[in-house]
C-alpha cells in the first residue's frame, strides 16, 4: 500500500519509503499544526526523492541546506505556509580542523575518526579536505562532543575550531570524452563513456544497474538527457555535457565528462 502511494518514484527501497512517509507526515503537520521540522543529513539520492515528493504534492514550503552553497549532503526543512527559514536556522555546525601540511589526511580518515566517536552517518554532512586544513559539517547536537573529544585523525594531531571561512576549494577533476552514438539510450552512451561494447553495456545495466541522477535503473533502453549524471559500479561517474548534432549517417554526436 505504501509503495503504491509513491508509484511515480520507481525502484524504492524500504528505507526510501520510510523517509517519504516521514516527510509526508511533516507536510501534514506543517499544514495543520504549523510545525517546522528538520531532517538529519540526507545524501544526494534522498534529497532528490524529497524534491520529487514535494513536486508531486505541489508543496513549496521546504528548503534543503548543507551548511554552504552546493553542498552534496543536506538537511531538509519543512515549514508552514507564510513561514520563512534562513540558513542559520538549520541545526548545522561547521568545524574546521587544522593540522600540519605534511599530514595527508583524507575524507575517509576524518569520517572514520567521527565514526570512532560513535557519531552516526546521518549526523555528518559534507567533509571538505584541503592542505593543512579541513572542514566538516555536523548536526549541531553532536558538534560539542566532536570538538571536545577529537584530537587526532589517524596519526595526525588536529586542532578544532567552530566555523568555516570558505577557504577550502575542491576542484573536481574531469576527463572529456566525445564521440557518436546510434541513439540516446543508456546502453549506447555507457558504451562510449566506458569504452566497452554495446552488448556488454546492456548486460551491465541489466545485471549491475545504472544510476541516473542518483536514481537506480536496470533498463538499457532508458533515454538519457543533456545535463544528466550517470554511473555504473566499477566504471565510474559521468555527466552528459551536450548533444552536438547529428552526422550524415544520423548518428548523434555527444560530449561527456568523466569524473576522475
Locate the predicted segments by residue.
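Short strand-turn-strand beta-turns centered on an Asx-Gly dipeptide
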Residues: 212-214, 233
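Short, well-ordered loop/turn sites that connect or cap secondary structure elements
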Residues: 204-205, 224
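Ferredoxin-like alpha/beta domains used as RNA- or RNAP-binding modules
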Residues: 1-193, 216, 223, 236-260
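Structural motif
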Residues: 227-228, 234
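Short hydrophobic/aromatic patches on the structural cores and recognition surfaces of FHA
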Residues: 201, 210
